[in-house]
């Protein structure tokens, strides 16, 4: 159970970082 929770937590963090970088690149590209 702990491995599944940590896996989903890591997936959520990776998704957040990816979306944050994507938004940052989009803003830079927009300017």
From Swiss-Prot:
Location(s), subcellular: Plastid, Chloroplast thylakoid membrane
Family per record: Belongs to the PetL family.
Broad class of the protein's primary localization: plastid
Q: Which HAMAP family match?
A: Cytb6_f_PetL
Species this chain originates from? Pelargonium hortorum
Question: What InterPro entries would the database entry show?
Answer: Cyt_b6/f_cplx_su6
Keyword hit for Cell membrane: no
Q: Which domain of life is it from?
A: Eukaryota
> Which cysteines in this chain are paired by disulphide bridges?
none
- Put simply, this protein is called Cytochrome b6-f complex subunit 6
Assembly, per entry: The 4 large subunits of the cytochrome b6-f complex are cytochrome b6, subunit IV (17 kDa polypeptide, PetD), cytochrome f and the Rieske protein, while the 4 small subunits are PetG, PetL, PetM and PetN. The complex functions as a dimer.
What are the GO BP annotations of this UniProt entry? photosynthesis
* Gene name of the record: petL
């Amino acid at each position: 159970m702990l491995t599944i929770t940590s896996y989903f937590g890591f997936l959520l963090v990776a998704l957040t970082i990816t979306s944050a970088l994507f938004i940052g690149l989009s803003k830079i590209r927009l300017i």
